[in-house]
Amino acid sequence: MLFRSPEVGICAGNIEIIDSNGRVMPGKEQRKRDLPFRRLDFDDLFLDRKPGPMAPTLMFRREGLEKVGGFDPDIRLEDVYIELAVTKAGYVIDILGEVLAQYRKHPTNTYKNARFMVDNVFKTYSQFSDHPDYEQVIMRFRNSMFLKCSNRDKVLARELLSGLPLKYWNEKTFRGIARLFFS
């Protein structure tokens, strides 16, 4: 795919979720297994218009990585940053509609470390603060993480809520408030 399509900077596929013992998880855990082929540009990723690529399946065009200066050593959530940087440079991401990897779900997956995710996604998004919808993107992420943290990490949840202006409150905000104070 990369050879035939010079506009493609990253190629990826879907994933199948397995548990810590290597068993395939039930259907409700497989939201990212049967997604159709999709092509994403910068706005598709940044504005979350289409499901993004799965990190374990990423294959990069060397020229694309070189064009953006490679990975940023100050951002430890490398996949989100490099996907955005490569698409901002004018490339697209093609995601095949087939499973290319299994992803093991266990208690210490990176995405379960809320503080790490919040800090690094904010740091990543700040690299693209010139986008006209930057504030909306930040507030959507803040709302989403507030809801996730509201019954897991109440200190972080309160911090996220305190940075969420009323004009960005939505159903997730109210669900998070209910969890924060009643769970």
Task: Show which residues each predicted segment covers.
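Residues within well-ordered alpha helices
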Residues: M1, G64-L65, T124-Q127
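Conserved donor NDP-sugar-binding/catalytic core segment of glycosyltransferases
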Residues: M1-G27
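Glycine-centered small-residue hotspots that permit tight backbone geometry or close packing
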Residues: A12, G22, G69-G70, R152
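Conserved nucleotide-sugar donor-binding catalytic segment
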Residues: G13, D34-N120
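Residue-level structural signal for beta-strand termini and adjacent loop
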Residues: Q30-R31
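C-terminal subregions of glycosyltransferases and related glycan-biosynthesis enzymes
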Residues: L47-D48, Y81, K88, I93, ...
